[in-house]
């Protein structure tokens, strides 16, 4: 059986997805690398490294080499990409793969080139850079070649990409540095300010998933969480409600809604009419926040 040599990569701030031609999504793991500074060696990548966040000794850093959709550490990103490419290809990787890789629509040419170069260095034979909204539209089953307006809102781990696409091109777009990671930081700040308790990223993410929302819930939920009292330094347990968390997220979720409105205002009338008829396609991990679709409506 021939080796799979065409793969697609969604290189996100929070996670990385790898698609292999003819096989579908073959890998989904956190974009995290555990790096040993003393030994100058990568200790873990992906889910194993994510489990180390906040739990490593001083010589080991659990880092995200991507921030807000762009590379912040080229060498670590290259090593991470190489690892995931080899893992996705398996033993059948007799040839270097052709890789399509996504970038936010608002990246600069320098940032775009950095992603391309890191992908080549990681072992690609050919590299095709695809704007994230275009990839999201294709993945949603839309025929982007038709003369019809489609609005894509991709709330990723580092940025929110908003675009109106028609005839295989981006007519209007905007990329804002607000994301599902911003939701986590909102929760961390709220708990610290309100309860004098510090919680980690993983706890904040769990709160977001279980009781977080962008729109009022029919039934209020509560969740018990554990952290560290910032005054005494001792372990602390508190209970937060879904109403509290919605309030903590309100500024960020409203900024996303405002950014969508700003793109619509710049959209040609005919395409805006198409969007009104066809609706908005929400993608990305942040779009899974409960009530996000209702808020945008």
Give residue spans per PLM region:
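Nucleotide/phosphate-binding catalytic cleft detector across ATP-hydrolyzing
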Residues: 1-155, 163-280, 287-297
């Amino acid at each position: 059986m021939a080796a799979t040599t065409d793969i697609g990569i969604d290189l996100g701030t929070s996670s990385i997805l790898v698609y292999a031609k003819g096989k579908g999504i073959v890998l989904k793991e956190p974009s995290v690398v555990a790096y040993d500074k003393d030994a100058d060696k990568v200790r873990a990548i992906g889910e194993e490294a994510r489990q180390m966040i906040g739990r490593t000794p001083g010589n080991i850093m659990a880092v995200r080499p991507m921030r807000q959709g762009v590379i912040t550490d080229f060498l670590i990103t290259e090593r991470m990409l190489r690892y995931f490419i080899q893992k996705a290809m398996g033993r059948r990787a007799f040839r270097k793969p052709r890789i399509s890789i996504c970038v936010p629509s608002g990246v600069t040419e320098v940032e775009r080139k950095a992603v391309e170069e890191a992908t080549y260095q990681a072992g690609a034979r050919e590299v095709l850079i695809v704007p994230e909204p275009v990839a999201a539209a294709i993945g949603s089953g839309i025929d982007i070649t038709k003369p019809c307006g489609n609005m894509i809102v991709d709330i990723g781990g580092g940025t929110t990409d908003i675009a109106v696409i028609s005839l295989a091109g981006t007519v209007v777009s905007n990329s804002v540095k607000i994301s599902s990671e911003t939701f986590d930081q909102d929760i961390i700040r709220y708990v610290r300010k309100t309860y004098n308790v510090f919680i980690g990223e993983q706890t904040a993410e769990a709160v977001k998933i279980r009781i977080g929302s962008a729109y009022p819930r029919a039934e209020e939920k509560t969740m018990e969480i554990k952290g560290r009292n910032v005054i005494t330094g001792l372990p602390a347990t508190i209970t937060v409600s879904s109403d509290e968390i919605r309030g903590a997220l309100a500024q960020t979720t409203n900024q996303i809604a405002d950014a969508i409105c700003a793109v619509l205002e710049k959209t040609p009338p005919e395409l805006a009419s198409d969007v009104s008829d066809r609706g908005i396609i929400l993608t990305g991990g942040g779009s899974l926040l409960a009530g996000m679709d209702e808020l945008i409506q």
